[in-house]
Amino acid sequence: PQVALTIVLVMGAGYLGSSIVLVEGAQTLESLKDAMVFVCILLFGYPALIGAVVAYILSDMIEGVSPDVVWRWIECFPMTEAYCWIGYQFIGKDPDFRKLRTWGWYALFVTIFMAFVPPLWGFACGPLSGVFSAQDSYYKITPALFLTLVFTWILVPPLMLGALPLARRLGLY
């Protein structure tokens, strides 16, 4: 059930986030989808890794990314989840953001994630796949992704403060 629940939650968060416009014509609350991926991985562990990859692929296609582009990025989809797995190793056993210890490990995880994931997707979008030029990929996409991910990591703690007690009550954590 955790794989299916992850797919539903991530796709639902993607749909909701893409309908909330932060900057007209430029920025939606796409961060909500990424935050939900991390929340699901923290709550469900390994099954969420599988569900999140499927959810990202389906969500991108529903949002209008062509199957050709999705195929060119296919080996990159598990990358974000792999880095989230590092965060799971740090705080997955006790992801309670009411505890100071959780915040310390979370800060370390976010630092590692932000140092590597935006440039890796810059590479994936440009030189690896050829979808965008290297210039656009590194000087436009990478900084935009960095900014989007800042919102992601701001959203995770309040989401976890609500999701963890609910998951415990439902027997999912």
Where are these regions (language model features)?
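Small-polar-interrupted transmembrane alpha-helices in polytopic inner-membrane proteins
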Residues: A52-D60
